[in-house]
From Swiss-Prot:
Organism: Drosophila yakuba (Fruit fly)
GO annotation, cellular component aspect: nuclear cap binding complex; nucleus; postsynaptic cytosol; presynaptic cytosol
Domain MIF4G residues, every copy: 31-243
Keyword Nuclease among record annotations: no
Keyword flag Phosphoprotein: yes
Stated name of the protein: Nuclear cap-binding protein subunit 1
Keyword line: mRNA capping, mRNA processing, mRNA splicing, Nucleus, Phosphoprotein, RNA-mediated gene silencing
Cystine pairings recorded for this chain: none
Residue positions where Phosphothreonine is found in the record: 9
GN (gene name): Cbp80
Subunit structure: Component of the nuclear cap-binding complex (CBC), a heterodimer composed of Cbp80 and Cbp20 that interacts with m7GpppG-capped RNA.
Record-level GO BP terms: 7-methylguanosine mRNA capping; mRNA export from nucleus; negative regulation of viral genome replication; nuclear-transcribed mRNA catabolic process, nonsense-mediated decay; primary miRNA processing; regulatory ncRNA-mediated post-transcriptional gene silencing; RNA splicing; siRNA processing
Region (Disordered): 1-26, 669-700
Pfam families (alphabetical): MIF4G, MIF4G_like, MIF4G_like_2
Amino acid sequence: MSRRRAHDTEDEGYDHRRNKRRRVSENQEIEDRLESLILRVGERSTSSVESNLEGLVSVLEADLGTFRLKILRILSDCAVRMPEKCTVYTTLVGLLNAKNYKFGGEFVDHMVKTFKESLKLCRWDAARYSLRFLADLVNCHVISATSLLQLLDTMIDVSNEDTVPQVRRDWFVFAVLSTLPWVGRDLYEKKESALESLLLRIEVYLNKRSKKHHNALRVWSSDAPHPQEEYLDCLWAQIRKLRQDNWAEKHIPRPYLVFDSILCEALQHNLPAIVPPPHHDNFEYPMPWVVYRMFDYTDCPDGPNLPGAHSIERFLIEEHLHHIIETYHHERKDCAAQLLSFPFKHKIPLEYCIVEVIFAELFHMPTPRYLDICYGSILIELCKLQPATLPQVLAQATEILFMRIDSMNTSCFDRFVNWFSYHLSNFKFTWSWDEWDSCLLLDGEHPRPKFIQEVLQKCLRLSYHQRITEMMPTTYAKLIPLTPVPNYKYANEEAANLPGTTVAHQLVVAIRQKCTPEEVVNILKDIPSSGYSGEEMSDGSFNALKIDVFVQTLLNLGSKSFSHSFAAISKFHSVFRALAETEEAQICILHNIYELWSSHQQMMVVLIDKLLKLQIVDCSAVATWIFSKEMTGEFTKMYLWEILHLTIKKMNKHVIKLNSELSEAKDKLAKADSSSSDSEDDSSHKRKKPITHADKPSEEVVERMEEKLEAANVNQKRLFLIVFQRFIMILSEHLLRSDTDGRDPDTDWYRWTIGRLQQVFLMHHEQVQKYSSTLETLLFTSDLDTHILEVFQQFVALRA
């Protein structure tokens, strides 16, 4: 009997555990169903948004008792992550508040907490979407207009803070302005004087703020035909136009209007006092930008009109399209489909809006959010999905860009080249080149022929030389790239007169017979250090002829492909290192790569990248070589700046990696010390597994890491000093010579060069910013020509 009773008890225990698991499983299913219903509310279905909301409110109201916290979390997440459905979710919250006042208060508290947390963690978009949601809850009678105005006033108070960056003040003003389209009408009707007072404070701030950064962020230097407006100025003009229209806009869907009779009966909540967190030096704020304009209503002849540049609808449409790209940019097909499914597509010329927004992203200064190819691939998918209209709009946009290229920012010029060449490669390189042949009459340094030349160079990377030659009209012959073959001087007719020819031929035989690096060194040691016509140090610290013979011979033998060249460099890595002991020797290596491969830009780029990775040449040597007299003829070509930027990026990544490793080591050391002190005080073993002795870095290791980081920072600073000093020297020389000769200094060469200086500042702004005070003290001093100094001052103003 006793065994039977024990058996029964075990069965009861098993049943209890099984029932508990079933309940947990059932609860999880209900939670998943609730989440799915909330996420999909308002999306296209057989029923209207209003009936969707009514049904969902009934479901949620029944489940509030059990799943209150889950529902709160899902709704607050939707507010931040799905801002395009803001008014749908505020209506949902409003209806729930009308039925359950306590839940409404809990949601407001939860949303306020989300807002404050976003500000504290510098999640600026999340904070702005949270603020917008809170504001729209005023329309749904959940939050009182008075308490919202108090919050908006508190945020505008930040604009009066002293000794904080302007970008901080700008963001708080932008957050308030971008919220007003949702709630402006309600505030106008209920609290007009308070709203006007708020707008007056904003206007005072906007009138006194500095816009030194504006010119650095422009896509074009000219304002014709479309003004290049700074983002806050543009939004302020749009808000003023909205105010003139009595805050009536035509874009935002407002499902709560249908439920006004229910919502107006609900009790409202007051927002608590919210104080923005004070500024800290480690806070990073969004940088300013210039609003991109490519089209106006005259460019869209058929169908609905494009909203004016200062209509609030233009801002709302563009923001929505930007958010779609942000959400779906990882998957180009989904992104294109979502863009074409824009909910208000019948009210606007959608294809024009999409193309303008994508180019706005591509040309965004200082850098685009995503890789250039991301935007190119999305445009290709759009052309596939909408073949009847989108290719024509894109061709129209390309024509506009080409006609305005004379005043285009240099960084945007590069991106335009990269996009157009990529786009052509996906459409059989078909283009109506004859329409652009007027550019052939212009000087070779003019942006139009330069654009076509650079596009063909990029197309060559994506195709082959014969294909490029066949696709172009014969009139473009002078712009077609040279055949990309090595120029190996030791095989030329004049080779017999060159001092290294005999050894070069010996080296060819030895390498083909798979000789070792040591055997190569033995062959090279017979080369005399004198009698070489190339540049060489007077003290003979390196043998230029040795480098010449070795580099040109080895790379010529590996010229069949990138892989062959890489294999050759890797095999004879030790020989390269032995020959490249000084910076001058490294520059000599670069000189020989250029001499061999001057007709193959891509080969030069990848070879120099490989030499940097293998630490055969230093970053500073590459920078010095780029600004050498030898490269004067190449100075305005894109590939040279591609090399400089990959060099700087290589250095930046090295510094960031060392910084990260040091921080990680310090954290481990601190945690290990903390664990050991805890173990002395606490005999309990119920704590997290401590860091083992093997994981703990020693203080000596941390010190060595600090020394490595310090050395890397010194090298990084030196690299930037070399680059900026060389820019200053050549630009100052040009300006002085022009002044002396009485010539206009504003030549094509000057515009390219000053544009490249600006590009270095903007592309690497995060790293250069660390050394801005050093640069100001040593290089960009007050006695420098204002044209050069302005570029530096505009850069500093970006974070001021």
